[in-house]
Amino acid sequence: MPARLTAVLTALMVLAACSSAPATFSLTRATVDPAYWCPGGSNNAPYTVHATIQARNDTANEVTIDSATAEMVLTSVSGSWLERVGDRYVAEGVVVSPRTVAPRSSATLAVTVPSACTSAVYGSSRSSSGAYEVRLHLVTSAGAFSIAASNTHEIRAA
C-alpha cells in the first residue's frame, strides 16, 4: 500500500508541475497626474485627471474595454477644504484609449477622468489642498478589473 500511495502522489505532483495557469488579462502600474492647480475664483470648474495603466493580455483573444469609472477618495487635506477625509467621488464618462488590447501583447492605456474643483480667489485666503487616492475600474470582454494608482492626485486651491 505505501508504494502505491507513493506512486499516486508522485503522479499528482508531475501533473501539477506540468500544468500551467490559464492565460489571463491583467492591469499593473497605474499612475495619475500628481497635482492640479484649481484656477482662482473657480466654482465647480471642470478639468481632466490623466492616468496611465499598463495592461497585459496573455489570452489568445483580443480584449475590448467596454466601460470605465474612477473612484477618488480624499485621503488628506491641508488648510480649509470643502470635503472631509474619506469622502468619495465616482467619476462617470471615463475615457480609455486604446479600447482594445491585442492577443498576447501589452499596451499602455491612457485614461481621462472628468473632475471639478472650487477655489477662492488667490490671495483672498490661505492656500489649501486635498490629496485623493484614485482607483480605476474597467469592464472588459475578459471580466471586470480594478487597480489603484501608485500615487495620489492632489488638488491645490486658494
Where are the regions a protein language model picked out?
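Surface-exposed edge beta-strand/loop patches
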Residues: 30, 73, 114-158
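Contiguous beta-strand segments within globular domains
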Residues: 43-54, 64-65, 69, 110
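The feature marks short-to-medium sequence segments in extracytoplasmic or secretory-pathway proteins
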Residues: 56-106
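Short, solvent-exposed, Trp/other aromatic-anchored flexible loops in extracytoplasmic proteins
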Residues: 88-132
